[in-house]
Amino acid sequence: MVSLLLFSILVVPVAVVQGDEMKAGQVGPVPKGGVCGSVDVRNSPAHLDRLKDCVVVEGFVHILLIDKYIDSSFENYSFPLLTEITEYLLLFRVNGLKSLRRLFPNLAVIRGDALVGDYAMVIYELMHIEEIGLISLMDITRGGVRIEKNPKLCFANTIDWKAMTVPGTNNYIKDNQKDNVCPICPAESTAVMLPNGSKQKCPAAPVRGGNKDHKRTLCWNANHCQTICPPECPKACSKTGVCCDAESCLGGCNLPNTSSCSVCRHLSIDPAGKRQCVAKCPPNTFKYHTRCVTRDECYAMKKPISLDSNPDLPDQPFIPHNGSCLMECPLDHELITELNKTRWCRKCSGTCPKRCEGSNIDNIQSAQLLKGCEIIDGSLEIQLRSRGGENIVKELENFLSSITEIKGYLKVVRSYPLLSLGFLKKLKIIHGKGNKVSNSSLYVVENQNLQELFDHNVTIGEGKLFFFNNPMLCTDRIKAVKKYNPGIEIENESQLESNNGDRAACSITELETSLKSIGSETAIIQWAPFTELSDARMLLGYVIYYIEAPYANVTFFDGRDACNTEGWRLDDISDFNMDKETTKILTQLKPYTQYAYYVKTYTLGSEGLGGQSKIKYFTTAPGTPSVVRDVEVSVNKNMLTVKWLPPLKMNGRLKEYEVFIELNADDNEQLMLRDYCEDDKLRDIVPETPTSAPPPKTSICTADQCRNYCKAPTSGGSTGTIDVTDKENQITFEDQLHNYVYIKNPLLRDKTTRRKRSTNLLFPNNTENKKNDTTDRRTEKVKDEPYYQYIFNATNETSITFPLSYFNHYSLYVFKIRACRHPGDPPAPSVRLVDVELACGNEVFENFRTPKKEGADDIPPESILIEEQSNNTQRQIRVQWKEPSKPNGPIVKFVVKYQRVDLESVSSTDICIRYSSFNQTRGALLTKLEPGNYSIRVMATTIAGDGAPSAARYVLIAKDDSMGTTLIWLGTLIVIFLCSVGFVAFYWYKYRYMSKQIRMYPEVNPDYAGVQYKVDDWEVERNHIIQLEELGQGSFGMVYKGILTQLRGEKCNQPCAIKTVNESATAREKDSFLLEASVMKQFNTHHVVRLLGVVSQGDPTLVIMELMANGDLKSYLRRHRPDYENGEDPSPQPPTLRQIIQMAIEIADGMAYLSAKKFVHRDLAARNCMVADDMTVKIGDFGMTRDIYETDYYRKGTKGFLPVRWMAPESLKDGIFSSSSDVFSYGVVLWEMATLASQPYQGLTNDQVLRYVIDGGVMERPENCPDNLYNLMRRCWQHRPTARPTFMEIISELLPDASPHFQDVAFYNSQDALDMLRGQHQTVIIDEATTPLRPGDDHDEEPGEDDDLVGHGEGHIGDVGTDDEFSMEMTNSHLVRNNGPMATIRSPHSPLR
């Protein structure tokens, strides 16, 4: 069924101009806010509103972690304006979402400027998605596609992803729905029409890699083909394959203008609200990503969301310069800030020094920020604490080699990787201005491997030199710097020999340290001041050393040699008070890890006197456990076992593993779209592109493994890659994905003022352990079943076992497993433990389908019924059976096998019945049989495969007696002849004599013939009714809402509708009022309004009916027009196409019941159908209903009111009413629903309508009405009554789109309906040459409700006004005279848009 979304797509056209040429008037305005930044949607579908009005998203789109929602939660969200995403699209764990077709119907391009790993589109662990549905997507400019672990996703392998991505891109598609239980691609699209009127053919996948035997059809779903552009315009054509302007367009265009691009290939510009494509930006505009902006727009650009956490970057950092909108000035330019804060880049005369603020280089990333800097307006500190990085000196040379001046000091401390300061190749002078470290401009301390200083002379402006504890640095290198700067002193010159270039031992005094507080990644260490020195100025500071120590056996010199990269980490403390205790916060620790630490002093004492503590140990607080690994579900005999590996990082003491299991029932509607009778042997689609991730860049494998890796693909499509490698890549990608998805909330801080970090932020007062309790702890069985919908359990082991009886056979289950830890314990009463991390890790999902149950698909043998239905013209057998009660998944077809057993060498014949067809017929008809003895067997097929054929049943078809047959034929002909003569004579007499005397109304049913109402069991005491507010005016009087407190002796409080008769009503009108109630007593079905009781004793007379809370269907439809003014915000949404189909089949079911009861409604219209609180539509208002129990029609007299706009031609011409005329009215009701209750035959007077319908005219198709719905209307409007379908046939046609609840309550599935269906003759429907009503319009006023009925006979058939702006337009038919002037078509509203 085509989604309603396709009728409401609004594509924003983009015109094409060349260079800086500006062509006005080519396209319409772009909505305000058409360009959006990155969008992150998580936790609720309501946040999707952030995409409203977005045409381009400059950044990424995240849709993540939306739990506990269903598909209807996404129905009201659609973003047809969005055509382009510049970075990537990521969907992760979004429940309820079945397709992206409604969300992004026009998304054409994903540019991939930034990627998730190597991928520009990731769809991962969406439990309910059934199709991708990005029907307009044509280009993924950079990066690949990763679609993984989506258990219900079909059509992932029917897309040629290579046609979208650049050559060499790796796409990864794995662990989705099996292709053999998915619908197949159609031969042609049902949604796209070519200019010549034919449907678009689905293309075949190109043959790549020589695999000519494997052919695939390319499509997005069962209705939409993938669009593959011709070679001359790759990725730039319309949906019908017409080439666009390939030089300017990307992703399609809007015909007939091939230059009206959906997305611009190069650049776009929006002058005066009209977008245009350009090859380069016009003057006075600046390039920003893929668009041109004005100077003011560039200044107004906000920094990307990915840089929000950088407080040093202004909120609006962009600068217009040289035709580009940049965040930084280019090389040889300097940033100028005017007094009015206007920022611009100025080219320097000659060499332009790039100035940068002082910085602390502690890793390569921080060094990268100084790339190109020449003058440091401040001090430069280098402290590389990392232990690795073989290219670190090359990186420093790349980023710091341009520095020529340092205004402050240069400090190089504890930089293990450095052998030389030669990476500062252009450094000329260190000015030493401002604050200094120990009054020194060059401060070099504790560099274990430093051997050289500068490879050229560097001038020291002010301050002194300070070198301390550089064991590999010779003092002559230090004195060489002093020699070049003779006026500069060395602060500790007398100690140079003892602590530089030598590992001289020092006199050590023990320091007392204590642990004050620990968190998962932090610890606070405290110690008393060192007071052993005679001169306090000789104490330069402290150094704290710490290292991971799992076994508490470390020594002072572990990892301290120059060659080892794994050793003590250290921090220096230069800010201390001699009179107070010193406190140090250790950061970047690992959770639940034991560390060793000690504290050492830095002194200037000539004796080498210093202080040092003992090595002590502490364990950090627990953290959040990482995810469990390698989940595996298996079944052994009658037990189901779940196994997994522990997390790589438990980050605490294991408390338990929580296991939550949820049944993911097979309710995939797409399953029924495939014809398993025709496509029975279709195998899984083998993607022609590799669906595995690329192998690591470097790997070691054995010779056998390498041979296996290089093997050609097997017949099953396996690429022969090493499973271990693929598994490692999956784990790596999942870790990357979690880093994108699960992020900590940043600490709140003032971005305008930098301040020292407070320990309260690292160690909050609230130390209560948090638990991410998202797992549903329910254990709940499926209603009336022995197996479970939800199972929750916990264990300390890495496996858990359940009885297989807990699970339904061959059903899909989602296993969610996570690890949980115990709360942390403080190591001592004096130590504060801060345990604020989540106690449970993230869940890992694993999908598993339980084994099939043997015998579950077998047909119950006692249910098979065989009935010979042979006659004189043909021999046939009716076979009926009941389906298996609990099959292995959904049933897709049945096969009936029959064979002659009285002859040898006669093979079996198979008849295949689709499951949807079986729901209508409940069996099969075997035709064209020869006389003989037959064996018959029935077999069911589910998604698990074929069941066992039933035991053979035998039936004998006897030969015909030729003489007996002849006599029967002769007798039949004689009887037919006599009946015909009598029939003609009777009607000749009737029309010649009786019609002159009296007009007869056949009333054959004795229940209907009486006039006097008789009290019966339906009588209700008046005091058992509570009357409430008015609901509206009925046919006989006011209708009230009420409550029925007692019904047939049983207490109840049932809401009801109370129909009254006017006080001025005559006795005849009261009898007619009660007569309607008498008619209702005979009805008992779900889709006809139910009578509850009658109050006939006393006045006023009351009829108690079932309450229909939403009123009549006509009013309901008009209330749901898009611009209906009801004072609500927002306005009610129009009913969807699926809802309209549901209403249509409910009305047809009610009418089928009336037809089976031999009732003709005569006034079927939207105003006479009622809408219940649960949106069920039922037949109501039987004021004109008549019982024709034994006759086939009812002839209306010449007086009264007739609803001419709903009446069939035979009713208008001859006054004949039958079930076929009700079918004609039913077609008009469908037209009303398609137009939200517009008036039929808009623009014609009632007299014109009467002549128009009698002459064969019908209404034109409503705007945006699907073919199947309008075809049904046309069949209902056949001029010949016998050519119209019956209501039972209508239900059969609409049944595949009906809700499951309909099957449970419908009359259609009752035994009476089945008998009625078997009794109907097959009728060939011929679309007669009728004249459709052509759309025009006029400007009359809205008619009143009484205009729906027209006085006929003695009353005048008066003119009727046209409907309001929602109406269908005036006719232009040659059958109607004096139509009046034609006018432009106004905006009709249809729910089918």
From Swiss-Prot:
Reported cofactor(s): Mn(2+)
Signal peptide start and end residues: 1-19
Active site: D1163
Record-listed ATP binding positions: L1031, G1032, Q1033, G1034, S1035, F1036, G1037, M1038, V1039, K1059
FU repeats (start-end): 240-287
Regulation (activators, inhibitors): Activated in response to insulin. Autophosphorylation activates the kinase activity.
SMART domains, alphabetized: FN3, FU, TyrKc
Region ranges (Disordered): 754-779, 1328-1365, 1374-1393
Role summary: Has a ligand-stimulated tyrosine-protein kinase activity. Regulates cell number and cell size during development by regulating cell growth and survival, affecting body size and organ size, including ovaries and imaginal disks. Plays a role in life-span determination. May be involved in regulation of other neuroendocrine signaling pathways. Involved in the development of the embryonic nervous system. Functions upstream of dock/dreadlocks for photoreceptor (R cell) axon guidance and targeting in the visual system.
Subunit structure: Tetramer of 2 alpha and 2 beta chains linked by disulfide bonds. The alpha chains contribute to the formation of the ligand-binding domain, while the beta chains carry the kinase domain. Interacts (via C-terminal cytoplasmic region) with dock/dreadlocks (via SH2 and SH3 domains); when autophosphorylated. Interacts (via beta subunit) with chico; this interaction leads to tyrosine phosphorylation of the insulin receptor substrate chico.
Name under which the protein is recorded: Insulin-like receptor
Species name: Aedes aegypti
